[in-house]
Amino acid sequence: SKFFFIASAWNGYIDCNIKSGDAGFVKIVEKGIIEYPEYDGNSMYRTAGNISKNPNVALLFLNFDGKSRRIRINGQATIHHDKKSIEDHFGAKFVVRINCEIYPNCPRYIPNLEKDEPSAYVPRKGKGIPPAPEWKERDYIKNILPKDDPHKNRN
């Protein structure tokens, strides 16, 4: 799957986000351990912030083709900023690694959307800086983007 949903929680609040990338962006490290890159996001770090306080996560992988099985994963996540972890994921700010239990699930009720168009926002080798998402152009956001944000001083 080129995307998955991840639920994380801290302080009584559950947060669900979508994570996406090119095919293979989620890597199997070894039996029972997967990892994925965290790219430039909205600087809220909700998933990463929750993981730093509570490592328990739930992931849902699915293809909207009407036939592929869903994959549910429950596990404990850790955040890795080391060079070795990051170099395996082009464009990553850091890597999230998950010790997991995997539960295959039937494709019943999954719609067939069959539109396979890659996101222009995923960093790709040789493609330069991805376009800025609309929200980074908002006046109240522009000035508070991180210093190293590639879209901070673009017009």
What would you call each of these model-derived segments?
Residues 1-155:
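Binding-site signature for planar aromatic cofactors or substrates
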